[in-house]
Amino acid sequence: VLDALKDLGVESHLVVSKAALLTLSQETDLSPAELTAKATVVHKMADVGATIASGSFKTLGMIVAPCSVKTMSEIATGVTSSLLTRAADVTLKERRPLVLMVRETPFHLGHLRTMTALTEMGAIIAPPLPAFYARPASILEMVDQSVGRSLDLFGLDWSAVRRWEGLK
């Protein structure tokens, strides 16, 4: 997401949880420093006084990627104990797009009800599912497609997205 936003010339604000850092080290070759270097602004999770914690700070919206079930549940219940959940809460109250790229599977009924509640509040649940019609040749192409589809929800058109061209 950060690479795409940089390509598009869009300012990005990054908040990373401890769990996200563990996921980063397990699933990518990026170091935390390399990740944070991709963002325009980096905020600490505990900094609930950051700019993005206020509705008066203008943003296009927010993407939580990846979004854990824990974070999703906190957002759904209005728990704002970290900057991540506070910024998401502000995004909802200001009626800006909030895209949650929930990646846990399978879902149980509680997860689905939480997703329903969030959708009713205005959030968009967008699991990072591969678009096989795009015939991805690598994991990176699958990731880029999911990122691009999420950016579409903000009216941002990223060139890495392969668009559906109909059956051939």
Residue ranges and their predicted role:
Residues 1-99, 103-168:
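A cross-family phosphate/adenosyl-ligand binding-site feature
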